[in-house]
């Protein structure tokens, strides 16, 4: 496959949804350190944002390595297979390798919801309102 023009194509990282996802993740990490356990939000909020935060970075890396032929939004198959692989590794392989890791099926639901948010955003919405502030 032919790599993108330049060593990194950062089109996916310029998308407002990626910035919002990173902000949700980071703000929650700081908030989580200051607050008591608040149930589902405390335990699964960051799992929800895992795919929207990580997949654009991974796909940009694939492009830089010449493993991805286009720089457009992630396809449904890319979202599904990366989410499935991540869920399998984090919830089934991780607990076998690390004593502190715990398999939690609610995490799988959070990964799936995050994948659905990604798919919905990149295939059914425009978010033009936010694109003005995040243009490069």
Where on the chain are the PLM-derived regions?
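Bulky hydrophobic segments
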Residues: 1-136
């Amino acid at each position: 496959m032919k790599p993108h023009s330049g060593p990194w194509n950062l089109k996916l990282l310029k998308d407002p949804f990626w910035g919002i996802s990173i902000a949700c993740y980071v703000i929650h990490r700081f908030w989580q350190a200051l607050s008591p356990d608040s149930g589902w939000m405390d335990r699964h909020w960051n799992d929800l944002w895992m795919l929207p935060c990580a997949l654009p970075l991974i796909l940009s890396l694939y492009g830089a390595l010449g493993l991805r032929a286009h720089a457009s939004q992630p396809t449904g198959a890319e979202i599904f297979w990366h989410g499935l692989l991540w869920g399998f590794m984090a919830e089934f392989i991780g607990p076998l390798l690390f004593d502190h890791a715990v398999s939690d099926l609610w995490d799988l639901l959070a990964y799936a919801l995050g994948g659905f948010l990604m798919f919905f955003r990149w295939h059914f919405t425009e978010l033009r309102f936010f694109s003005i502030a995040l243009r490069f």
